[in-house]
């Protein structure tokens, strides 16, 4: 059995970890970062870009860059109006009234977009470990519905991963904190404020058991909402000052989003920050275009006023979790803050104030704790971690619709999973031969105020007076928090059931088709990455050639210059149309040949005139230290021979 990785699939950033020597470690990605932006883009030529590179091009490609897809996964169209109004990409109704997105005329489900992020994380883990990865534990917000959990599993399947377990994010954070405190009896409250959700869980830790006592949260409150108050403040002020509505310009809104996110981050450590956005819009003054800019100072106190309602809203789930667990603030031993937005000083102060001045524990990294916990759970499932038992709960009650539109709970919230419950119901009218079972999730008394999960029918009931037939309903929840419901007529033995899948749930054939599609893209993605690296080398080479030519035109004859320029143009053209590995290798050879030509010209230039000051080719570090046959770390001096001055540059070789 290969390594099982732990993945924190976040709204803003994602993170992957793995167990090494019994301890969880973060996997660095190809870019050398410990987290990866959960962003997917499609370029002009249809090339798919994921992560940091997708984030870098978002301003110039706003309509085809998808972010915060976690806000839409497993949710219905009518429930997402506020979220849809904020994004710069196009949302369209999908199967079963879900939310799909359009990128470059292609319609994608949230599962597919999430799978693209998961696929990159998987590839990064394979590069890091040097072996294939096929299994994972993925975390989700504790307040994710059954449909959202199943949709996340579907995304994992599309990415080619067998999802061994879905773990609640605050529970994973507690695992990462408590792995070295297994025999310490304590109650931990985990406050997890991520990009789109807030979760609060209370756990009892002792005798190697992590038992969740209660969980509460808000699926519509996260870091994105704190960014949004700054975006609105900037857009409103600009509208008042310039009579230009930046909300109508997707590129401008994307720039506002990025600047607002950075301002929020800055204000976590600084008392004030400057938001500078030149050329954000253009106005017509006296018939001529005039560029407009934003340069404004935002103080931490201003931001806290703008976000005061959001800060206050974070306290409600804490109160609910304490109430559900029958605990007081004095009975909580540790408070863990998790999620990037938990760094906001106003949040930390509000939590500390609520707990009577008790200081939250800041020893764990808010961005990495959840992935580390997922890796520990992966180790438990893989047998590497022993004597650790995790007992999680369902966040919302599960039940069904009964006569009069009443929601009847079968399994109460905060019930430990896995679990099952059975209850007997009967018919509502005489001669009734069919019952429809409507399964819901929520806490309200009426059906209309709760989340519908699915419906199915049990037919073939023998006609009888109402109240006579006995219909046995069984609710079964697995360790992932995913529900199976079955109904059986005790009189005939006839049975029917349903596995609650994601809203707009994908069939196994659809998942398989998307998985094959993702594998096809994987090869294209690798070619695109290599092409970008090659293009960077080429641009450096061309820049060096042009600067050398500009400063030393007398060193090249027309006969020498023309073939070089032809080679440069051919390479530039070739880099625009690479489609396979063979073409890529051919371009590498052409680039290497061109590099040698330019090296030769540069060497000739130095031989002719010791005063030439332009290095002909953009040097790498290896170029500067030179080749060293004896393997020692020598210092190589590059000198300029000049009667007037001698410049010596020392470069020390470092292994």
From Swiss-Prot:
Looking up Gene3D superfamilies in the UniProt record yields: 3.30.420.40, Actin, Chain A, domain 4 (3.90.640.10), Substrate Binding Domain Of DNAk, Chain A, domain 1 (2.60.34.10)
Instruction: Give the InterPro entries listed for this entry.
Output: ATPase_NBD, Chaperone_DnaK, Heat_shock_70_CS, HSP70_peptide-bd_sf, Hsp_70_fam, SHS2_FtsA
Q: Name one GO biological process term.
A: cell division
Any idea which residues bear Phosphothreonine here?
A: 197
Record's keyword terms, sorted: ATP-binding, Chaperone, Nucleotide-binding, Phosphoprotein, Stress response
Q: Which domain of life is it from?
A: Bacteria
Gene Ontology terms, MF aspect: ATP binding; ATP-dependent protein folding chaperone; unfolded protein binding
Instruction: List the NCBIfam families.
Output: PRK00290.1, PRK13411.1, prok_dnaK
Q: Would you identify the family this protein belongs to, as annotated?
A: Belongs to the heat shock protein 70 family.
Briefly state the protein's biological role. Answer: Acts as a chaperone.
Q: What is this protein called?
A: Chaperone protein dnaK1
Look up and give the organism this protein is from: Synechococcus elongatus (strain ATCC 33912 / PCC 7942 / FACHB-805) (Anacystis nidulans R2)
